[in-house]
UniProtKB/Swiss-Prot annotation:
The keyword GTP-binding does not apply. Residues 419-429 have a biased composition (Basic residues). This is Mitochondrial inner membrane protein OXA1. It comes from Arabidopsis thaliana (Mouse-ear cress). GO terms for molecular function: membrane insertase activity. Residues 378-429 are annotated as: Disordered. Expressed in stem, leaf and flower. Signal peptide: none annotated.
Length: 429
């Protein structure tokens, strides 16, 4: 029985030496008492081991020698805490642990959800269900807002300028191609006139199409070159519109992210100042830059008229939009205006290697429209193929009379009757 008790005690001491457990967080007032208790525990612990080693000499003989277990100084403290039965000591330490538990429960655990929510940006939560380009624009605006510390309206303005500046090389390339198309327009008109003079038969159509293809290849453009600007500006405007509208709906800080009279960016402008400014800036941009790169194109006037009408309709159409959208729209209009004014300067055109267009002759308006000419050629080609599939049937002289008008048929019938009467009268005589 004594052997089992000794073995169990020593195994527990060995485990506590390797894995010491601290169940008490001492206070400043307990330092002296803890040091006294530690010295007492070490003395009692060594005397206890000495007594056990004397009484259990048989166990040491069986094992081939005395069992030495080197223990750390903390094991005496742990042993004393488990083996001590001093009154009042454990209750005070338990009180300390209960106080710590209350502090953790009341303050720390309540702050964890708030800290976790603050770690995730409100824009990230708003853009979680958005399409990738729209979410990327929202993150771009948020990055500008985070790194610069600007208000939301200024962050939208800066993000608009950065993204529109990145599209300038594409706009310059589109302007070069449009200018090349204007330069080759007289040659296209000469090909069209040549095709009309030759009767627009199948051989002439094939030759004209071949010449046009070679001409487009020579200048490095396509018939859809004037639409490149629409392909660039259209999707960009739609993505910006959807991104800012989503942020105005789901980002709470937009309610105080404005300035002057538009402090709340989530509501429409009750004074209608921003819609009017948007329409005016767009109209000025149209008047200054609508025909840039479209010289010699008869569609330029139509495009300018449509843009004027759209500028006037902008005010009533945008009255219900959030004010955050106008921070982008007005900035984009001003950027387009400045870009058009700069790109029209001869020095800038020379530096960017944009070819100059020859001035049109006075009193003569170009009448060639590329798209209408292509449509006419396509329609004539289809008619020609249908005629080849259905060859004309030979004309029957008997059936040709059926194609005459009813009046001519009546006249011929009367002539035959008159001739018949004359023959009958001559026979009677």
């Amino acid at each position: 029985m004594a052997f089992r008790q000794t073995l169990s005690i020593r195994s527990r001491l060995f485990a506590r030496r390797n894995q010491p457990v601290y169940h008490i967080i001492p206070r400043e007032s307990d330092h002296e008492r803890d040091s006294f208790c530690q010295e007492t525990s070490q003395r009692s612990y060594h005397s206890f081991l000495h007594q056990r080693s004397v009484n259990n000499s048989d166990f040491s003989k069986v094992s081939g020698g005395s069992l030495h277990l080197p223990l750390a100084p903390t094991s005496g403290f742990a042993f004393y805490r488990y083996m001590s039965s001093a009154p009042g000591v454990g209750s005070e330490k338990i009180g300390v642990m209960s106080d710590i538990a209350e502090v953790i429960t009341d303050s720390t655990l309540q702050d964890v959800p708030a800290q976790a929510a603050a770690a995730v940006s409100e824009v990230t939560l708003a853009a979680a269900d958005s399409f990738f380009p729209i979410a990327a624009l929202q993150q771009c605006i948020d990055m500008v807002h985070t790194f610069t510390g600007f208000e939301w309206w200024a962050s939208i303005v800066v993000a608009t300028i950065l993204i529109r500046s990145s599209t300038v090389p594409l706009l310059i390339k589109q302007m070069k191609d449009t200018t090349k198309l204007a330069l080759m327009r007289p040659r296209l008109e000469s090909i069209r006139e040549e095709m009309q003079n030759k009767g627009m038969d199948s051989v002439t159509m094939a030759e004209g199409q071949k010449k046009m293809k070679n001409l487009f290849k020579e200048y490095g453009v396509t018939p859809f070159t004037p639409m490149k600007g629409m392909f660039i500006q259209g999707p960009l405007f739609i993505c910006f519109f959807l991104a800012i509208r989503n942020m105005a709906e789901k980002v709470p800080s937009f309610q105080t992210g404005g300035a002057l009279w538009f402090t709340d960016l989530t509501t429409p402008d009750s004074l209608y100042i921003l819609p009017v400014i948007t329409g005016l800036t767009f109209l000025i941009t149209v008047e200054c830059n609508a025909q840039e790169g479209m010289e010699g194109n008869p569609m330029a006037g139509t495009v300018k008229t449509v843009c004027r009408v759209f500028a006037l309709l902008t005010v009533p159409m945008t009255m219900s939009f959030p004010q955050a959208i106008f921070c982008y729209w007005i900035t984009s209009n001003l950027f387009s205006l400045m870009y058009g004014l700069v790109i029209k300067r001869p020095q800038v055109k020379k530096m960017l290697r944009i070819p100059d267009l020859p001035p049109p002759p006075p009193g003569q308006q170009p009448s060639f429209d590329l798209f209408s000419a292509l449509k006419k050629m396509k329609a004539m080609t289809q008619d020609h193929t249908q005629n080849q599939i259905e060859p004309p049937s030979p004309v029957n002289p008997r059936l040709s009379s059926t194609s005459l008008s009813p009046v001519s048929k009546r006249l011929k019938a009367l002539e035959s009757q008159v001739k018949g009467r004359k023959k009958n009268s001559s026979k009677k005589k």
